[in-house]
Amino acid sequence: MAGDFSNRAPWKRSACDRCRAQKLRCHRDSGHSTDACLRCLKSGIECVTSKARPTGRPPSRQVQPTVVVEQGDTSSSSHTTDSSPSAGGTDMSNMMNFEYDLSLDNILDSIGMQHSDFMVNDNILVDISPLSSSQSTGQHSVTQAQVQAQTVDPSTIQSTASYQFNSLPSTSSMDSALPIRSDHVELLLSRLHSKLSAQLYSIRSSPWDIKGTLNLSLAHQGIGQDFENCESHPLVQVSQACTELERLLSGLRVPASAEHTPSSFSYTPAVPPRLRTTQLLIALSCYIQIVSIYGIIFSKVFDYLLSTSKTSNGSYQSSPLTLYIGGLPIPPNETLSGNLLVHLIEHQLHQIEQLMGLPEHYRVSSRAKDTKDGELGLFGSQHSQSLLNAAIQLGEDRDGNHDDIRCVRALKVVMRQIKDF
C-alpha cells in the first residue's frame, strides 16, 4: 500500500534528521541491516529519522449514492442513482480507471527529489491560515458594525452631531498648503461670526481689565503655551479671531501663481472657482465685527491713559515698565505700550485687509502706494466691488453715514490719538 509508512522499503523511507536539516538527499543502502543512511554511516554517527506523516496517494473515498426526485404529471417518485462507474455507463467515469501509478513518490523519484524535502516548508501552510482567518474575521466585524449601526441609541444622536460639528477640518499653519473645500470654509466663517457676535455683546455689557491690556510680558514657552487655565482677555480673544480669519481668507483667495505658472507641480485649476455671495458677506461681517471690538478696546485704553496722566498718584498708577534691547535699558514711557499695541493691531488688520482686497476708505491700516495691494483679494474684482458697495449702501442713512464705515473711522481716530498722546 502506497500510504503505509511501515511497509515501505528501507531505501525509500523518509530522510533522516541530519540530511533534512542540511537539505541533502538521504541515500540508503539496502544491503545493511541497520536503518542508517550512507552519509551517517560514513560519519560514524547515529542516524535518527523522526516520524513523518505517511506519503503517497491518499485512499479513494467511497462514492455515496445521490437521490434524485422527479415530479411527474400525476404522481412523484424517488429514484436512487448510483454514481459508480459501472452504474452510469458513461465514458467520463471509465476514463479514471487507468493503471498508471501517479503517486507523489514516483513523481519525485523520477525528478531526483524526495517527499521529505517538502516537510521543511510545512510552516508555509501555517502562514497562510491566519490570512484566511483574518478575512473571515473582517467579514464578521463588518456584519457586527452593520448591526450596531442599525441599532443606534436615540440618546446618543445629539452628542454625535455635536462631535461632528466640533471635529471640522481646521485650517492651521501646518496644512495651509492643502486645498480647503469652500463649504468647509463657509461653515468655519459662520462659526467665527457667531463667536465674534458673542464677544462683541460681552465686551459692551461686562466689565473687563483695561490695565491688563497694556501689560507687556515675554513668553519663553513659545506659541504652544496653554492659556486655558488663565482668564481669557478680550484682546486675546479678538487676536485669535483675527488669526483664524486670516487663515480662512487665505484658503478662499485665488493664488497669484494660478495664472502665470500653469505647468507647475502643484494643482492649479485653469478656471479659478467663483466665490459665493454668502462667503463674501460673512467674511465682510467678521471683519466689521473685529474692527468694532478693537474700537471699543482702544477707546477704553485711551480713556485709561488720560486718567493716569492727569492723576500722577491715582489708583490706576502703576510702576513704569522697563524694557531692554541688547542689554541696554529703554527709558520708561507711559504711552510706549499703547504705541506698540497700535502698531501690532495695524499690522494684524493689514494682513486681513490685503486678503480681502478692501478699498482705501474701508481700511484701518494705510495702503502701500508702490504695490498692487488688494487687487487679488476677495473684493478685488469688479463684481465683488459691486456687491461690497451694494451691501454698504443698504445701511446708509439720509446723510450718507453708515455704522460700519463709522466704526472704521472711529478706530482710525482713536489709534491716531494714542500715537500722538
From Swiss-Prot:
DNA-binding region (UniProt annotation): 16-47
Organism domain of life: Eukaryota
CDD domains: GAL4
Region (Disordered), start-end ranges: 50-92
Chief localization: nucleus
Protein induction: Expression is positively regulated by the secondary metabolism regulator LAE1.
Location of this chain's protein in the cell: Nucleus
UniProt biased composition (Low complexity): 74-86
Molecular function terms from GO: DNA-binding transcription factor activity, RNA polymerase II-specific; zinc ion binding
Biotech applications: Fusaric acid is phytotoxic to plants such as cotton and banana. It has been shown to induce programmed cell death in plants. In addition to a mild toxicity to animals, fusaric acid exhibits acanthamoebicidal, antioomycete, and antimycobacterial activities.
Keywords for the protein's UniProt record, in alphabetical order: Nucleus
Pfam family name, one: Zn_clus
Protein name: Fusaric acid cluster transcription factor FUB10
Organism whose genome encodes this protein: Gibberella moniliformis (strain M3125 / FGSC 7600)
Gene label: FUB10
